[in-house]
């Protein structure tokens, strides 16, 4: 499929909307009423610090809702107001935040069900309204919904769309897209659907493994087994890794994405020489500004004198998970929670998710005496949720 041609035709359809329905001013007011917090605003104005009794709170200087998330959430709410009686569907979670998704369910927005990773669109009918989430949707899903006669409300973050343009450029010039991401993540599934040949690498370790293979030091069967769910149909590592371009899932760790780009640039330089580098490697710049800002702020926060650190965001949120990883590199006692309800004031306990593990209960997690607590949140977490967490910490400390 010519994905660029399809997207152009879709954008000209009278059943497609990527601008929403309200003015920017009205949209900002609605979000402020729903999700902003006077407490958080006050802490921002006070240099991102807040002291109450023995508790000293230090907020990251960039956290919470990014503008892409704000736009997606606002457009989803506007859609229900604009279509008060129609069937409204959404192809996935609008963002990785349980409270926001629960609110959409209360507005009678239906979530497309999936079994074994395959979505069931059989109940979606002609004239229904379908919201595409901030992560985007695969080009095959868009085509199916358009052919069904649905009204498509596209809340895809423009930074994600930028990555789609990048992999389409790779395809046009017959380069294989090396996508730094999680192959099951909604955003990476969408991005890979716009690519030609592609290979998804999770981290620097996998990138180095691929690099070694390109330089003739790997085993084909082992390679194919290792990446069996992470490459395009018909992918041949002996042919399709001679010309590569790098792209990324926008919520991945910025520093790792940059290093992966350098790995493949050095690999192609070594294999083909400097005079042929541009014929075998395409440079990239698909790192999201908001992701970069939040990760940079987290690196600054973990350099503070902290006793514990609380990271707030959906457990399936990639950008939140990477914030947790940064805390771990500094050996700070950190706790990843998705809602304030994970904290029990009465028990001084927290039900949290250690990186790569199942949920576990930590009792007496807030130490006695004066305590410095660092707090940050993922790009899908509203300020009100952060404020509710702080209020619980204050109640425990008092």
From Swiss-Prot:
It catalyses: isopentenyl diphosphate + 2 oxidized [2Fe-2S]-[ferredoxin] + H2O = (2E)-4-hydroxy-3-methylbut-2-enyl diphosphate + 2 reduced [2Fe-2S]-[ferredoxin] + 2 H(+); dimethylallyl diphosphate + 2 oxidized [2Fe-2S]-[ferredoxin] + H2O = (2E)-4-hydroxy-3-methylbut-2-enyl diphosphate + 2 reduced [2Fe-2S]-[ferredoxin] + 2 H(+). Its EC number is 1.17.7.4. It is an enzyme of class 1 (oxidoreductase). [4Fe-4S] cluster binds at residues 66, 157, 288. The active site is at 187 (proton donor). Catalyzes the conversion of 1-hydroxy-2-methyl-2-(E)-butenyl 4-diphosphate (HMBPP) into a mixture of isopentenyl diphosphate (IPP) and dimethylallyl diphosphate (DMAPP). Acts in the terminal step of the DOXP/MEP pathway for isoprenoid precursor biosynthesis. This is 4-hydroxy-3-methylbut-2-enyl diphosphate reductase.
């Amino acid at each position: 499929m010519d994905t660029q041609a399809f997207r152009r035709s879709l954008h000209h359809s009278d059943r497609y909307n990527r601008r929403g329905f309200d003015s920017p001013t009205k949209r900002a007011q609605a979000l402020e009423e729903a999700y902003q917090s006077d407490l958080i605003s006050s802490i921002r104005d006070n240099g991102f610090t807040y002291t109450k009794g023995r508790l000293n709170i230090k907020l990251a200087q960039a956290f919470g809702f990014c503008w892409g998330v704000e736009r997606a959430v606002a457009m989803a709410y506007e859609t229900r107001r604009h279509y008060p009686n129609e069937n409204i569907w959404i192809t996935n979670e609008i963002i990785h935040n349980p409270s926001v998704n629960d609110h959409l369910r209360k507005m009678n927005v239906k979530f497309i069900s999936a079994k074994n990773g395959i979505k069931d669109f059989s109940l979606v009918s002609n004239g229904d309204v379908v919201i595409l989430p901030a992560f985007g949707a695969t080009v095959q899903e868009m085509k199916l919904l358009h052919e069904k006669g649905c009204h498509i409300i596209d809340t895809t973050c423009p930074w994600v769309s930028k990555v789609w343009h990048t992999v389409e450029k790779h395809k046009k010039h017959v380069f294989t897209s090396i996508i730094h991401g999680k192959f099951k993540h909604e955003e990476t599934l969408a991005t890979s659907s716009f690519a030609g040949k592609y290979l998804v690498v999770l981290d620097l370790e996998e990138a180095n493994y691929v690099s070694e293979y390109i330089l003739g030091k790997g085993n084909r069967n082992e390679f194919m087994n290792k990446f069996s769910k992470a490459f395009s149909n018909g992918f041949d590592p002996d042919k399709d890794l001679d010309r590569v371009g790098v792209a990324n899932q926008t919520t991945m760790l910025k520093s790792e994405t940059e290093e992966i780009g350098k790995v493949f640039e050095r690999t192609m330089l070594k294999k083909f020489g400097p005079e042929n580098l541009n014929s075998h490697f395409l440079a990239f710049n698909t790192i999201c500004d908001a992701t970069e800002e939040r990760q940079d702020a987290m690196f600054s926060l973990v350099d503070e004198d902290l006793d514990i650190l609380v990271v707030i965001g959906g457990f399936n949120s990639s950008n939140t998970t990477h914030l947790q990883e940064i805390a771990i590199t500094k050996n700070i006692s950190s706790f990843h929670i998705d809602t304030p309800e994970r904290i029990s004031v009465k028990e001084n306990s927290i039900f949290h998710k250690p990186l790569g593990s199942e949920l576990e209960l930590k009792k007496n997690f807030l130490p006695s005496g004066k305590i410095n607590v660092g707090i940050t949140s993922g790009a899908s977490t509203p300020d009100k949720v952060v404020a509710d967490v702080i209020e619980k910490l204050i109640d425990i400390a008092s």
